[in-house]
Each structure stands twice: as C-alpha cells, then as structure tokens.
Amino acid sequence: MICYVLVAYILFAYMCVLQKETPLANAAFWAARKGNLALLQLLLNSGRVVIDCKDSYGTSALMVASYSGHYDCVRELIMQGADINLQRETGSTALFFAAQQGHDDIVKLLFEFGASTEFQAKDGGTALCAACQSGHSKVVEMLLKNGANIHDQLSDGATPLFLASQEGHVTIVRQLLSSGAKVNQPREDGTTPLWIAAQMGHSEVVKVLLLRGADRDADRNDGSTALFKAAHNGHCNVIEELLKFSPSLGLLKNGSTALHAAVMGGDPKTVILLLKANADPTLRNKNNDLPGDLTKNERILRILRPQILNGGS
C-alpha cells in the first residue's frame, strides 16, 4: 500500500501544477485509465478523493475507465457512488465513451445501473451515433434494446444510419434498417445515406440501401447524385449496383451527367460501364461541354469517339 501511495505522488505531483488538480485525484485518473484496481480502491477508500472529481475538460474517472475498457474499475467507481450520467464539457457521458470504443460489457454494466441513452454531445452525437460510426454492432444492439433513439441527428442532420453508411458498416446498416431507420433521411445539405456510401465506395452498403428502398436518384443540394459521385470517384462496384436500379443517366440538376463525372474522374472502366448502360456521350453540360471535352486522356477519348460518331447509340 505504501508503494502505491508513493507511486501516486511521484507520478502526479507535477501534473497538479499543470492541471491545478490534487495529486491524489490525478492518481485516481491514472488508475482508472490504466486499469489499476488496487490503486483506485486505495485512493477512493482514503476519503481524500471526490468520486466525481473532474479534469479541466470535465472528464470524470468513470468516463476514463469506461473509455479505456476497464470493467472492474468501472464497477468499483459505480459502487462507490460515481454519477453514471455525468456529462463532460462536450456533453459526452461514460456510456458515450464505452459505446464509441466498443466495450459491450461496460455498456451492459452501465445500463444495469441506470445509464441513459438520451444525453447528447454538443454536436448532437449520442452513444448510438458513436457506436454506429465506430462499427460496434453488438453495442448498437444493446443501445437499441435500451431505448436509444434511432432517429437521433448530429447538428448537421446526420443520423446513425448515415454515419454507419459513411463508414461502410454494413451489418449495422442492416440492424438500423430492420429497427425502423429512414433509408432516405438526408443530412441538412441533402446528402442521403446512399449518396455518402456511393461516394465512399461502399458497394455492399449501397446494395443493402437500394434493396431497402433508397432513392437511387436522390440529389444533394449541389445537384449531384449517388451515381454521379461514384462515377467521379471511379467506384466501379458501386456503379454496377446502382445501374441495376436504372438511375438517371441524363442531365442532372447540377447541369451535368454521370458520364461527364466519369470522364473527369479519369477512369476508363467507369466510362465503359456507363456507355454500356446507354449513357449518351453527345449530351452537353451547362457549360456546353461534351464529356469528351473534359479530358485529354487518350484512352478515354478512344472509347468515346466511336460512340459520338454513332450519335451516342
């Protein structure tokens, strides 16, 4: 025991000068972060450490232990009276951190002692948003069973489904859709889950979203569609999935076509895919440019020339 106290004072005395916290409080944070249960118990039982003491960012020892995945330390802090739903300055709670890191055992423990799914970070993020973005399907399942709102939104309008689609977490996408997530719910800038999945090249997510009724031609505020972005970024697998649902190959609200985007992207394979789907190389964009006017790539020009001579047929 004497050894633990000496370690605590030596390691953290200098930290209190920087953070204006007591050495013992800093030692408790260190023990929670490292999973040193014996030291944590010693410090808490000394009566000289406030159970919900915070660092300069409002982080508590329970949040630290939850983030780091130390089940026994989390349980000890809870049993000694730590506030489970205490919020950091950013609005995050212990549940948020455990969900973000995929510590399903700690998420379960926090729920057993009354953790709430309703708290939001300053950007609107919830524990469900964090788990979906990070790809922790088991945690997502637990959160949904314990009342997490599947329609939560970040300040920019992104939903849990949007975040999972953006990161390519197809299992979570399926979970959310099966639990009632709105497949076409856009972000404030008009970006839908399908659009973002297509841009990022997540073909399996695109496939699932389309099969569950995603609008293949939903456009963002700038007029671009999922096919337009996939074509521009050269995501052939995504293009193939989208073409199965007959998306628009004509002029979009942005005054351009997917073929224009493919040509600008510079990948001959995407150009070939669109031409085989009957994209018209004779359509001009809002600047009166043909797709072929937008490149000096000889491979692409050789692909386009016969089509143009044949009138796009």
Where would I find each of the regions flagged by the language model?
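Ankyrin repeat domain, specifically the short helix-to-loop turn at the C-terminus of the second helix
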Residues: 42-49, 75-82, 108-115, 141-148, ...
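Ankyrin-repeat-protein effector appendages
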Residues: 3-6, 10-28, 146, 179, ...
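Ankyrin-repeat junction/capping positions
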Residues: 52, 85, 118, 151, ...
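Conserved ankyrin/ankyrin-like repeat signature
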Residues: 39, 72-73, 105-106, 138-139, ...
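Ankyrin repeat start-site detector
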Residues: 23, 56-57, 89-90, 122-123, ...
